[in-house]
Amino acid sequence: MSLNEHSMQALSWRKLYLSRAKLKASSRTSALLSGFAMVAMVEVQLDAEHDYPRGLLIAFSACTTVLVAVHLFALMISTCILPNIEAVSNVHNLNSVKESPHERMHRHIELAWAFSTVIGTLLFLAEVVLLCWVKFLPLKKNPLDPAENSNSSITSGQAAAIASTSIMVPFGLIFIVFAVHFYRSLVSHKTDRQFQELNELAEFAWLQDQLDHRGDAISPAVTHFA
């Protein structure tokens, strides 16, 4: 095997392990967050005597449904592709990397990763905010608390929901900024690595050419002395 082929196989194995790690992380995250969303939908107890805003109930139902659908889609991709990658990675043969579908399914793996870690996490943050509003909004004022009765514009339930929203909204913005910064840093790192690998491949090719030329130069001399 030439140095160039050996370097290409090492690159393929590195991509295989990265794809496997992404699929494992996506499957664990999607299973956890979708399970939480389903439990929140089932266990939340709506007050039949309270008149909930129609928009709040529609937003909570839609957010929960989309959250579960997104994570189940990512989980389905991980479940379908991961066993094939695991079967190849457990074979102790360098040439078996060609049998792995990780390069052909690269877009699907990245889609599952994005759905699970970016879109799914943002929907989960929105789910927490809506759940706080649905849970705390029916709470009435405490007639025994004079401090609360003096402020007739807001109830304790509304105050709790507003507090959770005011905490979660800045955190969501920080999460978006961090996700964009992380993605740009990752793309920059991949670009640098690709340039480095191209330089290494060029050096390997030059070294292989030098060895071939040296072998061609030695062969006529050996034939002449023979």
Swiss-Prot record:
GO molecular function: store-operated calcium channel activity
The entry's keywords: Adaptive immunity, Calcium, Calcium channel, Calcium transport, Cell membrane, Glycoprotein, Immunity, Ion channel, Ion transport, Membrane, Transmembrane, Transmembrane helix, Transport
Broad class of where this protein is predominantly found: membrane
Gene3D superfamilies for this protein: Calcium release-activated calcium channel protein Orai (1.20.140.140)
InterPro entries: CRAC_channel (IPR012446), Orai_sf (IPR038350)
Cellular localisation: Cell membrane
Membrane-spanning ranges: 57-77, 111-131, 160-180
PANTHER family (alphabetical): CALCIUM RELEASE-ACTIVATED CALCIUM CHANNEL PROTEIN 1 (PTHR31501:SF3)
UniProt similarity note: Belongs to the Orai family.
UniProt name for this protein: Calcium release-activated calcium channel protein 1
